[in-house]
Amino acid sequence: MVRQSGSELSDQSDTDISADSDTSASQGSARHSARGRHRDSRQKGDSSSRGQFLERVVRINRVAKVVKGGRKFSFSALVVVGDGDGTVGVGYGKAREVPLAISKGIESARKNFFTVPRVASTIPHPVQGEAASGVVLLRPAAPGTGVIAGGPVRAVLECAGVRDVLSKSLGSSNSINVVYATLDALKHLEDPASVARRRGLDYYHVVPKRIVRAVNSVGASSDTA
């Protein structure tokens, strides 16, 4: 039997420990790099899918729930999402953290998309929408007017791609009611082409004349330039 001295045993144990530590470190770095690649690819996918839409956070509210052990805080977010070209939706998200509440609101808004009829950059006719005690009036405007509206109404109209419009809030100033009243107004808009077919009229007899003149003047000036 060959006996090893204490120094040889200690050197061998140190070598084994260092080898194990090197192996575990390499495995940990490999797992970390794999997680990093997965996270980066997931973030790139989210950014590419969200890059096609406009997102506006209208309101963030903190809610407290009183329980036996104290108070539990959560957040709610009202979010407007649209493609800026006639499609818009509104969602409401709730979570324990603000970013998660906003992401839930975005997903909810995408499930509620609908199409907004437009004439050039404005709406085809005056319309009024109501939601609870909120009342919003929308009127067509000539090209170049811009969005004459407050914060909640402006967020909905910009995401819907309406760039020239006049608006007035006649009821509650609560942002949630105002947003849903604006949505109700947009949902009551009718496509001028379908109205003209139903009435047996020409398209330009349905659209307001001042809007037609303004659109024609803008087109003529662009052709001249």
From Swiss-Prot:
Residues 32-41 have a biased composition (Basic residues). PROSITE patterns: RIBOSOMAL_S5, S5_DSRBD. Residues 53-116 form the S5 DRBM domain. It holds the Pfam family Ribosomal_S5. Keywords: Ribonucleoprotein, Ribosomal protein, RNA-binding, rRNA-binding. The keyword rRNA-binding applies. GO terms for biological process: translation. Residues 1-50 are annotated as: Disordered. GO terms for molecular function: rRNA binding; structural constituent of ribosome. It comes from the Bacteria. GO terms for cellular component: small ribosomal subunit. The N-terminal domain interacts with the head of the 30S subunit; the C-terminal domain interacts with the body and contacts protein S4. The interaction surface between S4 and S5 is involved in control of translational fidelity. Part of the 30S ribosomal subunit. Contacts proteins S4 and S8. With S4 and S12 plays an important role in translational accuracy. Located at the back of the 30S subunit body where it stabilizes the conformation of the head with respect to the body. PANTHER family: MITOCHONDRIAL RIBOSOMAL PROTEIN S5. Belongs to the universal ribosomal protein uS5 family. HAMAP family: Ribosomal_uS5_B. NCBIfam families: rpsE_bact (TIGR01021). This is Small ribosomal subunit protein uS5. It comes from Tropheryma whipplei (strain TW08/27). The lineage of its organism: Bacteria, Bacillati, Actinomycetota, Actinomycetes, Micrococcales. The gene is rpsE.
